[in-house]
């Protein structure tokens, strides 16, 4: 079983979040590149959205899943992009109700191992039918170490806001901390039910602690100390697939955007994007735009319409429209983010700190401004600003978490000023990290190690 030629049949059943589906599929492509066969379990109408990502159609096959109907869940909803954020717990409840179907499918497929994330019941199901289970996380191991460490769990004691503001006792980097408003949000998730009668934290803790192994898309050079911490705390082997870097885009930028960006000098444009699932309140949306305007730089903001607003145009104050005419675009639809970040006119990226977006930023020249909104985005921002020092985080109120237009402007100007100490530091660190990440042998090195550890686990 130790031979490098050993191949396996693997199943994958990720949470129905768009970022989770694409993250798992990225790993599927890497594993198929090693000769493994992958059965990818996915809601039947969502399959078409991932087919173009399949680099190994002879080894990766889709297994359609019917998402059960749940009271309150929109008809036909299959992923988080189909439901409003407050209703995602209903989608989780629907996913939990696929348990019997998944057992039948896994028995029929006769797989060797199943990769999963939010389905905390899958490890026990896998054991029952004699297969291994690996928890694969699309978020940082630092996040799991900070928030889920067994060190934090005391029987009969509820985690408090004060507990969450500081790292666990033996955490390798005590400088990583949460602000009061962030800790409040994390603490709320320890009691918030997420799909049936289980809290979000208990769901993830069970999913991690019941697994046979833990897998992450990162590298030791960036998060090695946190991977070691998790391995020690959970007593599970940790498999690293290397950083989740974007596959180079084969498409070309829409002509209208290329023409617009081409009007400005190299490295002068701010690109701001908050992902496909992040929706801001109207006041935050407007304050962010005022902050971009205050920099005096041209900007392109790709943002979803704020809550209770039909379009981005309707949410922009008339005074602001006048001020940004000719140098600012606010766009409410999807754009080709990789191509924007690669464009020579773009010099700054204001991000909500989703890991996929940050990965795209790290392999490009643009400077990074961090404006996290929820959950793992907050920890991602600390990795970038505190551990790696490759970006600057927008200052917020300690208690209320509110940012101002002035704080947005200040962060942008800090990273864009090549003569300032902060500007020089983040640029230098970013350049070094980009050089490391672009090493052609990096991915194959990590996947060789991942493959060997997987063989050890299954052997």
UniProtKB/Swiss-Prot annotation:
SUPFAM superfamilies: UDP-Glycosyltransferase/glycogen phosphorylase (SSF53756)
Residues at the active site: 20, 117
Pathway note: Pigment biosynthesis; anthocyanin biosynthesis
One Pfam family cited in the UniProt record for this chain: UDPGT
GO terms assigned for molecular function: anthocyanidin 3-O-glucoside 2''-O-glucosyltransferase activity; UDP-glucosyltransferase activity
EC numbers for this chain: 2.4.1.297
Domain of life assignment: Eukaryota
Keywords: Glycosyltransferase, Transferase
Record: residues binding an anthocyanidin: 20, 375
Catalytic activity: an anthocyanidin 3-O-beta-D-glucoside + UDP-alpha-D-glucose = an anthocyanidin 3-O-sophoroside + UDP + 2 H(+)
Binding site for UDP-alpha-D-glucose: 138, 335, 337, 352, 355, 357, 360, 376-377
GO biological process, alphabetically ordered: anthocyanin-containing compound biosynthetic process
Family: Belongs to the UDP-glycosyltransferase family.
Role of this protein: Glycosyltransferase that mediates the glucosylation of anthocyanidin 3-O-glucosides to yield anthocyanidin 3-O-sophorosides. 3-O-sophoroside derivatives are required for the color of flowers.
Protein name from the UniProt record: Anthocyanidin 3-O-glucoside 2''-O-glucosyltransferase
């Amino acid at each position: 079983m130790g031979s490098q030629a050993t191949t396996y049949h693997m199943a994958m059943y990720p949470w129905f979040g768009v970022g989770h589906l694409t993250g798992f599929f990225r790993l599927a492509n890497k594993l198929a590149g090693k000769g493994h066969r992958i059965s990818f379990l996915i809601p039947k109408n969502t399959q078409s959205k991932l087919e173009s990502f399949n680099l190994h159609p002879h080894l990766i096959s889709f297994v359609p899943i019917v998402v059960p109907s749940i009271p309150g869940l929109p008809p036909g909803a299959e992923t988080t992009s189909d439901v409003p954020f407050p209703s995602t717990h209903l989608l989780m409840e629907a996913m939990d109700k696929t348990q019997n179907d998944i057992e039948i499918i896994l028995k029929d497929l006769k797989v060797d191992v199943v990769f999963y994330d939010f389905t905390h019941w899958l490890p026990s199901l896998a054991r029952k039918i004699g297969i291994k289970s690996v928890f694969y996380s699309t978020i940082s191991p630092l996040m799991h170490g900070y928030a889920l460490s067994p060190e934090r769990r005391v029987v009969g004691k509820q985690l408090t806001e004060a507990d969450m503001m500081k790292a666990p006792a033996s955490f390798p980097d005590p400088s990583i901390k949460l602000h009061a408003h962030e800790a409040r949000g994390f603490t709320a998730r320890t009691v918030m039910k997420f799909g049936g009668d289980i809290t979000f934290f208990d769901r993830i803790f069970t999913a991690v602690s019941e697994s046979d192994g833990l897998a992450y898309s990162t590298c030791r050079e960036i998060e090695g100390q946190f991977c070691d911490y998790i391995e020690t705390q959970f007593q599970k082997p940790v498999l690293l697939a290397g950083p989740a870097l974007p596959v180079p885009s084969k498409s070309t930028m829409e002509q209208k955007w290329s023409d617009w960006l081409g009007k400005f000098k190299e490295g002068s444009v701010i690109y701001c994007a908050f992902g496909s699932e992040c929706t801001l309140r109207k006041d935050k949306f407007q304050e962010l735009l005022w902050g971009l305007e205050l920099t005096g730089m041209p900007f392109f903001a790709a943002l979803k319409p704020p809550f209770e607003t039909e379009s981005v145009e309707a949410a922009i104050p008339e005074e602001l429209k006048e001020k940004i005419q000719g140098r600012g675009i606010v766009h409410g639809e999807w754009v080709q983010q990789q191509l924007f970040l690669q464009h020579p006119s773009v010099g700054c990226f204001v991000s909500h700190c989703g890991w996929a977006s940050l990965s795209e930023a790290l392999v490009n020249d643009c400077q990074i401004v961090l404006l996290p909104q929820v959950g793992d985005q907050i920890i991602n921002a600390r990795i970038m600003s505190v551990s790696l020092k490759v970006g600057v985080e927008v200052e917020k109120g300690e208690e209320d978490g509110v940012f101002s237009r002035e704080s947005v402007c200040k962060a942008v100007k800090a990273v864009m000023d090549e003569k300032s100490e902060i500007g020089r530091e983040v640029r230098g660190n970013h350049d070094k990290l980009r050089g490391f990440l672009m090493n052609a042998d990096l991915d194959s090195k990590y996947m060789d190690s991942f493959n060997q550890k997987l063989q050890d686990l299954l052997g």
